[in-house]
Amino acid sequence: SKSITEVGHHLYAKGAILANLNWWLIAGELRPEWKGGHGGGEETAAVMGMDPALIHAEYLEEGEGIRNDVSDELPSASWMDVNFKGGSITIPRPIRSITDNGWLTHGMSIDPPTKATQAWGVEMLNTMAEYMRDFTVAFDKVALPKIK
């Protein structure tokens, strides 16, 4: 996000480096079948991998109830975007204005929460923990910037 980037710039000027590891993006880059959306299979599997009791399975079959909250001419394309003549336009608004249950897997139909399993979550979380560990070892060797 812009705020994290600004903090990173500030820290760099002070002689430090910020590394922002977005696990949900990296997981899909490491294994394309894990790529997902907000409230989709990827996030649901991650929660199942930690504690399956946290998932309300009775809601997994519910439809998303996506609304074109801005207008029919500007249909919802994602959480923050609407579609206009094939292009995505960002219009920041609360997720509840788009969907009642918080799921936004439309546009990412390969990632419905119904596909999530505990085994997927455990494998993904273990893979990401190993990746983050390996990154930390490599990042620890990076020379800090010189303060100007």
Model-derived regions: residue spans:
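Extended, histidine- and acidic-residue-enriched regions that form the cofactor-binding/catalytic faces
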Residues: 1-148
